[in-house]
Amino acid sequence: MVESQKAMPQPKMGRIRRIHFVGIGGVGMCGIAEVLLNLGYEVSGSDLKASPVTERLESFGAEIFVGHRAENAASADVLVVSSAINPANPEVATALERRIPVVPRAEMLAELMRYRHGVAVAGTHGKTTTTSLLASVFAAGGLDPTFVIGGRLTAAGTNAQLGTSRYLIAEADESDASFLHLQPMVAVVTNIDADHMATYEGDFNKLKKTFVEFLHNLPFYGLAVMCLDDPVVREILPQVKRPTVTYGFSEEADIRAINVRQQGMQTHFTVLRRDCEPLEVSVNMPGNHNVLNALATIAIATDEGISDEAIVQGLSGFQGVGRRFQVYGELPVEGGSVMLVDDYGHHPTEVAAVIKAVRGGWPSRRLVIVYQPHRYSRTRDLYDDFVQVLGDANVLLLMEVYPAGEEPIPGADSRQLCHSIRQRGKLDPIYIERGAELAPLVKPLLRAGDILICQGAGDVGGLAPQLMKSPLFAGAKQEKSK
């Protein structure tokens, strides 16, 4: 705990002392739990299995239960749940029966934000990276923010941290429209794309209106930071009745990038800002999508008065986020090695951005993708887009869809995706049976100099470390921490 934090007004939730998280190991839950622990609250939580995340929280004083049972919630003053938790969960049912409040995670995050200068990052893609860049730049500027991020910040070794300043930087989740609970001082919209459409009853106009509603949670003196390159963000811009700053590659943007040069993992560019000197910037991430994430960060940092030196330092010193084009190391193959990358991208737009980044940074190298679709409903709704974008790999291995609690949907599985991609005639995908070991399947396909990406939001995230430890890749070299 940080001693100087005493000077900062803290959430005082009346009679609430013990806070119980149902699904505490989830990426959106554990960060809030960690901040509350550091604020002195009693925290307990349950999850289906123990993990490094739950072990970390336990080391900080949280009481962790493996499995969901009614008695786990018996002594709680409030339950925090994510949208992934079934209302029939025994802990939730017990809390409702005993009139213990049950609140969504975003409502608890909003309570933390209510006492601070909140910076909320929304958008279909780029939230985690942008939030992480903001935390890095604010720290470089001496502002020591509290942050809650949807991925593990490499430099901090965690996805949440209690800071000593008035700033709280967090992701704003549109997937279940829970970002409407938040009332930040600054809000970013990186882009708006068709995803989680069941929340919006399949109505894209409803999704757009919800983003506008979110921005109108800003006070009249707040700031909306919006990506002008995204056509949907540009479309809703006239509807936003709050002060705005735009960013992008567009010449009309208030903050824009020119002279972009990518050299492997590094991207260099010049930033033009109204009434400011041009700024030369480098980030240790490939791709124009990450330039846009950096521009959003620069827009907010400039508005908050952070010096150019701190902005440059915070961006160049940024060490990345877990599973966002995370380089694990080099796998030995005949004649050389293969660069192994782990990535969370699970939407066609995200897959396309990663492929473009690889082609830009390593134009002569083959791209081998092991991809796992996430949710049958997303695969169905974006089927043609997946066929188009995945067909741009040089070699493609498709794992079966990660269901995330959904029942299979006919025609929306990986076998069908393989068939449709094969029909395009560009490449012949390999279907990976559920539970099959990857190393013996992928090794014969690899050539020296290849880039191998394990991509998706499901259990594909465990494959990169498995490959590094596989006897078939004895002598694999771990990526050194920057």
From Swiss-Prot:
It comes from the Bacteria. Its main location: cytoplasm. The lineage of its organism: Bacteria, Pseudomonadati, Pseudomonadota, Gammaproteobacteria, Pseudomonadales. This is UDP-N-acetylmuramate--L-alanine ligase. It holds the Pfam family Mur_ligase. It comes from Pseudomonas entomophila (strain L48). Gene3D superfamilies: Mur ligase, C-terminal domain, Mur-like, catalytic domain, NAD(P)-binding Rossmann-like Domain. GO terms for biological process: cell division; cell wall organization; peptidoglycan biosynthetic process; regulation of cell shape. Its EC number is 6.3.2.8. One of its GO terms (molecular function) is UDP-N-acetylmuramate-L-alanine ligase activity. It catalyses: UDP-N-acetyl-alpha-D-muramate + L-alanine + ATP = UDP-N-acetyl-alpha-D-muramoyl-L-alanine + ADP + phosphate + H(+). GO terms for cellular component: cytoplasm. It is an enzyme of class 6 (ligase). The keyword NADP does not apply. Belongs to the MurCDEF family. Pathway: Cell wall biogenesis; peptidoglycan biosynthesis. NCBIfam families: murC. ATP binds at G123, T124, H125, G126, K127, T128, T129. Coiled coil: none annotated.
